UniProtKB/Swiss-Prot annotation:
Required cofactor(s): Zn(2+)
Function: DNA-dependent RNA polymerase catalyzes the transcription of DNA into RNA using the four ribonucleoside triphosphates as substrates.
Pfam families: RNA_pol_Rpb1_4, RNA_pol_Rpb1_5
One Gene Ontology CC term in the entry: mitochondrion
Binding site residues for Zn(2+): 220, 293, 300, 303
EC number annotated for this UniProt entry: 2.7.7.6
Keyword annotations: Chloroplast, DNA-directed RNA polymerase, Metal-binding, Nucleotidyltransferase, Plastid, Transcription, Transferase, Zinc
Name of the featured protein: DNA-directed RNA polymerase subunit beta''
Gene Ontology biological process terms in this record: DNA-templated transcription
Catalytic activity: RNA(n) + a ribonucleoside 5'-triphosphate = RNA(n+1) + diphosphate
Organism name: Arabidopsis thaliana (Mouse-ear cress)
Subunit (UniProt): In plastids the minimal PEP RNA polymerase catalytic core is composed of four subunits: alpha, beta, beta', and beta''. When a (nuclear-encoded) sigma factor is associated with the core the holoenzyme is formed, which can initiate transcription.
Length: 1376
C-alpha cells in the first residue's frame, strides 16, 4: 500500500462518472482484492448516510420555472411570424419546419439551463434537485420534463412532430399534447423489443467474425505503428480522448525529448507515463495496434496491449476476439433499454452564431461570397474559404474571421448593432451527424389551376410522367376556381370560355329546347347516352353558325359532328383545330363535308426543326376502296428492255411517314374483306366471280374479278382482284416477272394479240399450283401531284415573311409507303396525299425548339383562337360563332355578359353582380382521357382600386358624345369577373357597318366610338396576355379570316400610353403594398387593368427551391389534397442510440449511409491506380492496398466511436480495431497480370498475397475490398465456422466440392466438434513454438528483401500520415 504522505486529499462532491474513474485508478494502484475491500466500506457508508437523511418526494417539490411563461410566449410569437411568412410564400414548408423545430428546441434548452440555477437560488435542498443533480436517480432531461416543458417529440419513425408540448408533467397535458406524448411512449414499448433483438443479432455477428482471434504470441516482430498526435492541423484533440487512446497501449518506437530517451520501444503506457509525455509536449507518439500485427488469424500480446481486467499485458491464450465483439455489441443492448425513460423526446442541436462585439459598419470582400438562402429561408451569403469581416466603429477597427461553409447574414456596408448575429457557423463543420435524405410532400390546400413562374426541366428519372424539376427558386401558384368533372354529360356541350350558371350540373334535364334567332324555325334537340343507332341521333352543336344572325333561317351550315361517325367529338383533341377552306358565302349554298386546314400543336406545345405545323387533305386524293400504292423513279431494266418494256419500280424504301416527295404515284384498287376464322365462305380460292356475288352469308362483292383467300392469325383475308387474265406461252419472258407497271402505249411484239394500252397497267403473276400459272393484268389509277394547291394563300402573308428567322414552307407528302396496302374501313375514305406546312428556322440559331400555344378569348359570344409560335409576331386565328338559345336548360341564357342583366323593355343596362355565374375553363385530366371543367366565378376574384395615386402619362382624351349607356358601362366595369371587359371588343362588329345584335343594346350615333381609348387590357385564363402595341390595334373582323391593322395614321388620337405599377398577368404575394394609402392585397394574378382599378384572381403561392419536384403540367387542374411538389432535403436523425445502432450496423456492414456515402470503395480504386502508377509494379499493389486499408480502417473506427461517445459509452479503440481489422484484411485478385497461384475474383488475405508475391518474385495484381461483418464471417478459413453461422447446406456443399480442409484453429469449430477450445487452459503452446521457428526461417531467407521492403514501407507510411493529417475531415479522429 502507498504511503499516506503520497496521497492527495480531495474534499468535494463527486458524481457517478467520477466514482467510475476512481475505481479504475484504485485497481491500477492496489489490485482487485484491495479495491473490493475499499468499495465495500464506501457502500456501507453510503447506506448509513442515505438512511439517516432519507428523501421524501411530494408533488409540491416540483417547482415550475418562473421564466417559462415569457419564454413560451416569445416562441409562439416567432412561430406566428413564421406562419405568416409561409402564407405569403416567403418560406417553403421544409424551411418552416426546420425553423419551427429550432425555435422550440432553443426554448426548451433555455428552460433546461434555467432549471439548475433556479433550484439553487430558491431551494437548494429540494429533493428533486438533490436526487437528479447528484446522479442518484434520474437525470436533467427527466426533471426538465417534470418542471420545464416536454418540448418536441419524435414519432415512431424518428421524424419530428413540429407541434411542441408546451406543458410539463407537473402542470398536466392537454388532450392534443397527451396524444402526441403517447407517440413517445409507444415508441419506447415497441422499439425496446425490436431494437433489443437487433442489438443481440449485432453482437452475434460481431462475435462470429472475430471468434478465432486469440493471443498466441508475445511479439510478432512488426516495426509498424500508428501515429497519435494531440495537435492535428485541423483541430485540437481533446485531452481526455487522447489519454484514453494511449493508456494500455505499447510503444512502437522510442520517444526522445531532445537527445534523451524518455520511453523505449515495446514499453506499455500507463497513466503516469502518458501524463509525463503530455507535460513534455511530445508532438506524435507511435503506438502498436491490432492493425499493425502481422497476422490476421491471431494477435500478439504487444500489439494488443494491456488487459482491461487487471491492468497488465494480456495473457497468452486470451480470447480477445470474443471480448471485442461483446464489448461493442453489449452496450447497444443496454442502451436500447435505457433510452426510453424520456419517452421519445427529440434531442438535436442548434447552429453556432458569430455576434458583433459593438456597433459599427460591416466590410468584407464581396468576391469571396455568393448569395444563397439559409436552411430557414433567410437571404444570406455563403463563403467558401476563411473570410475576414471588418467591423468599423468610430475609433476601433475589429476583425472577425468567418470559417468556410458559413453563412454571412449581413450585407456589405451594413450598420450592425452590438450583439447582433452577423454569421452562422454550420454545425456540421464541428460534429459529425448521421444525416439522411428525407422526402417531404406538399399537398394543395385548395383546388384550382397550377402555374409556375420559371422554366422547368423534365425529371430524367420520370421519363413518361408529369414530374418536373425546378432549376431555381421560384413560386408555384394555384389559381382559384371551382372544378367539376363532366361525367354526367358524356360529351359536354360546354366549350372553353363559355358563360354558364354554376349549378348547371345538378340539372337532370337531358333535353335542350333551342329557339332560333329569328323565330323562323323551332328545333328540338335531344341528348342521348345511347349510341346504338347513330342515324337517329342529333346533338345540338353551335360551333359554326352562319355569319349574319338575322338574315336566313336557322341553319347549321358547318357541324362538328357527323351522323356517320358520332364518336368524333369524343376523340376531339384540345390541341388541334380546323380552319374552314371555303368562305362563308360558298358554305351557305351547299352542305360541304369537313375539309380545311388542320393546325395541330403537339401535346407539350414544342416544335422542333422541320416539324409539321399545319396540313391540308385535298379531297382529290381520297379513295374509298382499298388498294396498293406504288411509286418511285423511272428506271430502265436491261432484261425488260429487250422485250421493249419498261418497269416502273421503286428503288427507295420509305422509312417514315413524311420522308419522300414524289411527283407521280399509282393506286391499284382491290376489294378486301377481313372475316373471322369461323366464317362460311361461299366462293373458292382462285375462282372468278362477277359483280354482286355472295361471298358469305351477309357480304356481297362490289366488283368482279379473281378471288384470293389467305388465312392469317385468327382471321381470313378475302381479296378480289379486277382485271384481265392472260395465259402466257413459253416465249413470253414477262411471265418471269411479277409486280411490274407497264406504261401506256407499250405492247408485246412477240404475242399474237398485239394491242396497245391506253392507261398504265399492273402485271401480277399468280401461281395456283406449282406447274400452272397465269398473269393478271390489273387497271391502275394514276395520280399526278400538282403544285396547284398553295397553302400560302390561305394563311396571312405575314407568316411567310422571314421574321425572327422563322420560315414556313409548303410540301406534299404521300401518307403510305411504296407497295404498302391501304385499307378502307366500311364507308370511310382514305387520304393518300397530304399537303403540309413545315416550320423551320435559321440554322445558325441556337434554338433547338420553339413553343407554340393556343390563346382563346371569348367576347360577346365570339371566340377567337390564336396560335403563338415562339418568336412569330403574327397570329393565325379563326372564329367560331356561338349561339346560346334564350331558354336553354343547361346554358346561361344571359350570354352577352353574365354580370349584366338586360331589360328588353327599357333597354337600360343594369349592373347586377351575380355570384352564381362563371366562366368555364376546360382541362384534360392526367390520364388525358376525360375532360374536367374549371369554373371561375366572381367569388374567386376581388377588385382592387381605384388608383388615386397612380399617375397616367400622355393621356389624349377624346370627345365622345355623352351617352348615358356609355357612361354607366365605362364607370362601373365588371366587378370580380374573369371575362374580358366588354368595352374593348364592343366596337368590333361595327366595322361591317351592319346593325347586328350588339347595336340593339348600345345605340351609338357617333362612329368615333369605334376608335375609343383602350381603358383596359385582356388576359385569358391561360395567363396569356394579349398585349396591344401602343401604335397599332389588332382588330378581328368576324366575317373574314384575316386581320386588320388600324395604324395611328387613321385616327391619331385613339391611342393612349399609360404607365402603371401593375402589369397585366402579374402575380402578387399577399401583403405587398402597391401605392401609398392603398389597402394591402391578397395574393393573386392581375386579370383586368382599368384606368382606376384592377381585378385580381385569387391565388395561393407555394415557394419551391432548386431540386424540388413539381407534380403536374403547367395550367393543369389540381384538386384539394393533390400532391403539388416534393422537397428532398437532408436532416439529422435524433440523437438517441436507437437511431445510432442501425448506423453502427451500416458502418460495420459497409453499406452507404443515405446521403453521406462512405465512398471507401471508390477511394480504394483511386488509390490503387495512383500508387501503382507512381511506384511501379514491384511493390505497387501491396503499398496501394496497404494505404487504402489504413485510411479506411481509421475512418471506420472514428465513425463507430462517434455513435457510442454521443451516448457517453466508453469503448476502448482496440476492441473496434480488432473487428475492423477483420473486415478490411482481404484483397480481391484481379485479372490483369494474373499469376498462376490465385483465380481472378478470389478473396485472399493481404499478408498471404504479400508472401506469395515475394516467394514467386513477381507481382500479383489485386485490389483491397471492404467486406461487411456478414461477408467476412462467410469468408474465413474454416468452413465449419461458416456453416454454423448461416446458409449451412450451401456452405457445406461448396466445401465438399472444393475439398476444403478445416484446421480447427478457431474456438467455434472446436465447440461444434466437441474438441478442446484453443484458448485459456486449452491453449496449445507447442503450436506457438513451432510457428515461431518457422517464421524465423523465413526471415533469415529473405532478410535482404524484407529489410528493403520495410524501409520503403515505412517511408510511404510516413508520407501517408502527413497526407491524412491534411485530408481527413474535421469529423474524423486525429489518430492515424
Amino acid at each position: 500500500m502507498a504511503e499516506r504522505a503520497n496521497l492527495v486529499f480531495h474534499n468535494k462532491v463527486i458524481d457517478g462518472t467520477a466514482i467510475k474513474r476512481l475505481i479504475s485508478r484504485l485497481i491500477d494502484h492496489f489490485g482487485m482484492a484491495y479495491t473490493s475491500h475499499i468499495l465495500d466500506q464506501v457502500k456501507t457508508l453510503g447506506f448509513q448516510q442515505a438512511t439517516a437523511t432519507s428523501i421524501s418526494l411530494g408533488i409540491d417539490d416540483l417547482l415550475t420555472i418562473p421564466s417559462k411563461g415569457w419564454l413560451v410566449q416569445d416562441a409562439e410569437q416567432q412561430s406566428w411570424i413564421l406562419e405568416k411568412h409561409h402564407h405569403y410564400g416567403n418560406v417553403h414548408a421544409v424551411e418552416k419546419l426546420r425553423q419551427s423545430i429550432e425555435i422550440w428546441y432553443a426554448t426548451s434548452e433555455y428552460l433546461r439551463q434555467e432549471m439548475n440555477p433556479n433550484f439553487r437560488m430558491t431551494d437548494p435542498f429540494n429533493p428533486v434537485h438533490m436526487m437528479s443533480f447528484s446522479g442518484a436517480r434520474g437525470n436533467a432531461s427527466q426533471v426538465h420534463q417534470l418542471v420545464g416543458m416536454r418540448g418536441l417529440m419524435s414519432d415512431p419513425q424518428g421524424q419530428m412532430i413540429d407541434l411542441p408540448i408546451q406543458s410539463n408533467l407537473r402542470e398536466g397535458l392537454s388532450l392534443t399534447e397527451y396524444i402526441i406524448s403517447c407517440y413517445g411512449a409507444r415508441k419506447g414499448v415497441v422499439d425496446t423489443a425490436v431494437r433489443t433483438s437487433d442489438a443481440g443479432y449485432l453482437t452475434r455477428r460481431l462475435v462470429e467474425v472475430v471468434q478465432h482471434i486469440v493471443v498466441r504470441r508475445t511479439d510478432c516482430g512488426t516495426i509498424r505503428g500508428i501515429s497519435v498526435s494531440p495537435r492535428n492541423k485541423n483541430r485540437m484533440m481533446s485531452e481526455r480522448i487522447f489519454i484514453q487512446t494511449l493508456i494500455g497501449r505499447v510503444l512502437a518506437d522510442d520517444i526522445y525529448i531532445g537527445s534523451r530517451c524518455v520511453a523505449f520501444r515495446n514499453q506499455d503506457l500507463g497513466i503516469g507515463l502518458v501524463n509525463r509525455l503530455i507535460t513534455f509536449g511530445t508532438q506524435s507518439i507511435s503506438i502498436r495496434t491490432p492493425f499493425t500485427c502481422r497476422s490476421t488469424s491471431w494477435i500478439c500480446r504487444l500489439c494488443y496491449g494491456r488487459s482491461p481486467t487487471h491492468g497488465d499485458l494480456v495473457e497468452l491464450g486470451e480470447a480477445v476476439g470474443i471480448i471485442a465483439g461483446q464489448s461493442i455489441g453489449e452496450p447497444g443492448t443496454q442502451l436500447t433499454l435505457r433510452t426510453f425513460h424520456t419517452g421519445g423526446v427529440f434531442t438535436g442541436g442548434t447552429a453556432e452564431h458569430v455576434r458583433a462585439p459593438y456597433n459599427g459598419k460591416i466590410k468584407f470582400n464581396e468576391d469571396l461570397v455568393h448569395p444563397t438562402r439559409t436552411r430557414h429561408g433567410h437571404p444570406a451569403f455563403l463563403c467558401y474559404i476563411d473570410l475576414s469581416v471588418i467591423i468599423e466603429s468610430e475609433d476601433i477597427i475589429h476583425s472577425v474571421t468567418i470559417p468556410p461553409k458559413s453563412f454571412l447574414l449581413v450585407q456589405n456596408d451594413q450598420y450592425v448593432e452590438s450583439e447582433q448575429v452577423i454569421a452562422e457557423i454550420r454545425e456540421g463543420t464541428y460534429t459529425f451527424h448521421f444525416k439522411e435524405r428525407v422526402r417531404k410532400y406538399i399537398y394543395s390546400d385548395s383546388e384550382g389551376e397550377m402555374h409556375w413562374s420559371t422554366d422547368v426541366s423534365h425529371a430524367p428519372e420520370f421519363t413518361y410522367s408529369n414530374v418536373h424539376l425546378l432549376p431555381k427558386t421560384s413560386h408555384l401558384w394555384i389559381l382559384s376556381g371551382g372544378s367539376c368533372g363532366s361525367s354526367l354529360i358524356r360529351f359536354s356541350i360546354h366549350k372553353d370560355q363559355d358563360q354558364m350558371n354554376i349549378p348547371f350540373l345538378s340539372a337532370e334535364r337531358k333535353s335542350i329546347s333551342s329557339l332560333s334567332v329569328n323565330n323562323d324555325q323551332v328545333s328540338q334537340k335531344f341528348f342521348s347516352s345511347d349510341f346504338a343507332d347513330p342515324k337517329k341521333l342529333g346533338i345540338y352543336d353551335y360551333s359554326e353558325l352562319n355569319g349574319n344572325l338575322g338574315t336566313s333561317h336557322y341553319n347549321l351550315i358547318y357541324s362538328a359532328i357527323f351522323h356517320e361517325n358520332s364518336d368524333l367529338l369524343a376523340k376531339r383533341r384540345r390541341n388541334r383545330f380546323l380552319i374552314p377552306f371555303q368562305s362563308i358565302q360558298e358554305q351557305e349554298k351547299e352542305f360541304i363535308p369537313q375539309s380545311g386546314i388542320s393546325v395541330e400543336i403537339p401535346i407539350n406545345g414544342i416544335f422542333r426543326r422541320n416539324s409539321i405545323f399545319a396540313f391540308f387533305d385535298d379531297p382529290r386524293y381520297r379513295r374509298k376502296s382499298s388498294g396498293i400504292l406504288k411509286y418511285g423513279t423511272l428506271k430502265a431494266d436491261s432484261i425488260i428492255q429487250k422485250e421493249d418494256m419498261i418497269e416502273y419500280r421503286g428503288v427507295q424504301k420509305i422509312k417514315t411517314k413524311y420522308e419522300m416527295k414524289v411527283d407521280r404515284f399509282f393506286f391499284i384498287p382491290e376489294e378486301v374483306h377481313i372475316l373471322p376464322e369461323s366464317s362460311a365462305i361461299m366462293v373458292q380460292n382462285y375462282s372468278i366471280i362477277g359483280v354482286d356475288t355472295r361471298l358469305t352469308l351477309n357480304i356481297r362483292s362490289q366488283v368482279g374479278g379473281l378471288i384470293r383467300v389467305e388465312k392469317k392469325k385468327k382471321r381470313i383475308e378475302l381479296k378480289i382482284f379486277s382485271g384481265d387474265i392472260h395465259f402466257p406461252d413459253k416465249t413470253d419472258k414477262i411471265s418471269r416477272h411479277s409486280g411490274i407497271l407497264i406504261p401506256p402505249g407499250r405492247g408485246k411484239k412477240n404475242s399474237k394479240e398485239s394491242k396497245k394500252f391506253k392507261n398504265w397497267i399492273y402485271v401480277q403473276r399468280i401461281t395456283p399450283t406449282k406447274k400452272k400459272f397465269f398473269v393478271l393484268v390489273r387497271p391502275v389509277a394514276t395520280y399526278e401531284i400538282a403544285d396547284s394547291i398553295n397553302l400560302a394563300t390561305l394563311f396571312p402573308q405575314d407568316l411567310f415573311r422571314e421574321k425572327d428567322n422563322i420560315q414556313l414552307r409548303v410540301f406534299n407528302y404521300i401518307l403510305y409507303g411504296n407497295g404498302k396496302p391501304t385499307r378502307g374501313i366500311s364507308d370511310t375514305s382514305i387520304q393518300l396525299v397530304r399537303t403540309c406546312l413545315v416550320l423551320n428556322w435559321d440554322k445558325n440559331s441556337s434554338l433547338e425548339e420553339v413553343r407554340a400555344f393556343f390563346v382563346e378569348v371569348s367576347t360577346k359570344g365570339l371566340i377567337q383562337d390564336f396560335i403563338r409560335i415562339g418568336l412569330v409576331k403574327s397570329h393565325i386565328s379563326y372564329i367560331r360563332k356561338r349561339n346560346n338559345s334564350p331558354d336553354s336548360g343547361l346554358i346561361s341564357a344571359d350570354h352577352m355578359n353574365p354580370f349584366y342583366s338586360i331589360s328588353p323593355k327599357s333597354g337600360i343596362l343594369q349592373q347586377s353582380l351575380r355570384q352564381n355565374h362563371g366562366t368555364i375553363r376546360m382541362f384534360l385530366n392526367r390520364n388525358k382521357e376525360s375532360q374536367s371543367l374549371l369554373i371561375l366565378s366572381s367569388s374567386n376574384c376581388f377588385r382592387m382600386g381605384p388608383f388615386n395615386h397612380v399617375k397616367h402619362h400622355n393621356v389624349i382624351n377624346q370627345s365622345i358624345k355623352k351617352n348615358t349607356l356609355i357612361t354607366i358601362k365605362n364607370s362601373s366595369g365588371p366587378l370580380g369577373t374573369a371575362t374580358p371587359i366588354s368595352n374593348f371588343y364592343s366596337f368590333l362588329p361595327l366595322l361591317t357597318y351592319n346593325q347586328i345584335s350588339l347595336i340593339k343594346y348600345f345605340q351609338l350615333d357617333n362612329l368615333k366610338y369605334i376608335f375609343q381609348k383602350i381603358n383596359s387590357y385582356l388576359i385569358d385564363e391561360n395567363g396569356i396576355i394579349l398585349n396591344l402595341d401602343p401604335y397599332s390595334n389588332v382588330v378581328l373582323n368576324p366575317f373574314k379570316l384575316n386581320w386588320y391593322f388600324l395604324h395611328q395614321n387613321y385616327h391619331h388620337n385613339y391611342c393612349e400610353e399609360t404607365s402603371t405599377i401593375i402589369s397585366l398577368g402579374q402575380f402578387f404575394c399577399e401583403n405587398v403594398c402597391i401605392a401609398k394609402k392603398e389597402p394591402h392585397l391578397k395574393s393573386g394574378q392581375v386579370l383586368i387593368v382599368q384606368r382606376d382599378s384592377a381585378v385580381i384572381r385569387s391565388a395561393k403561392p407555394y415557394l419551391a427551391t432548386p431540386g424540388a419536384k413539381v407534380h403536374g403540367h403547367y395550367s393543369e387542374i389540381l384538386y384539394e389534397g393533390d400532391t403539388l411538389v416534393t422537397f428532398i432535403y437532408e436532416k439529422s436523425r435524433s440523437g438517441d442510440i436507437t437511431q445510432g445502432l442501425p448506423k453502427v450496423e451500416q458502418v460495420l456492414e459497409v453499406r452507404s449511409i443515405d446521403s453521406i456515402s462512405l465512398n471507401l470503395e471508390k477511394r480504394i480504386k483511386g488509390w490503387n491506380k495512383c500508387i501503382t502508377r507512381i511506384l511501379g509494379i514491384p511493390w505497387g499493389f501491396l503499398i496501394g492496398a496497404e494505404l487504402t486499408i489504413v485510411q479506411s480502417r481509421i475512418s471506420l473506427v472514428n465513425k463507430i466511436q462517434k455513435v457510442y461517445r454521443s451516448q457517453g459509452v466508453q469503448i476502448h479503440n482496440r476492441h473496434i480495431e480488432i473487428i475492423v481489422r477483420q473486415i478490411t484484411s482481404k484483397v480481391l485478385v484481379s485479372e490483369e497480370g494474373m499469376s498462376n497461384v490465385f483465380l481472378p475474383g478470389e478473396l485472399i488475405g493481404l499478408l498471404r498475397a504479400e508472401r506469395t508475391g515475394r516467394a514467386l518474385e513477381e507481382a500479383i495484381c489485386y485490389r483491397a475490398v471492404l467486406l461487411g461483418i456478414t461477408r467476412a464471417s462467410l469468408n474465413t478459413q474454416s468452413f465449419i465456422s461458416e456453416a454454423s453461422f448461416q446458409e449451412t447446406a450451401r456452405v457445406l456443399a461448396k466445401a465438399a466440392l472444393r475439398g476444403r480442409i478445416d484446421w480447427l484453429k478457431g474456438l467455434k469449430e472446436n465447440v461444434v466438434l466437441g474438441g478442446v477450445i484453443p484458448a485459456g487452459t486449452g491453449f496449445n503452446k507447442g503450436l506457438v513454438h513451432c510457428s515461431r521457428q518457422h517464421t524465423n526461417i523465413i526471415l533469415e531467407k529473405k532478410t535482404k528483401n524484407l529489410a528493403l521492403f520495410e524501409g520503403d514501407m515505412r517511408d510511404i507510411l510516413f508520407y501517408h500520415r502527413e497526407f491524412c493529417d491534411s485530408s481527413i475531415s474535421k469529423s474524423d479522429f486525429s489518430r492515424i
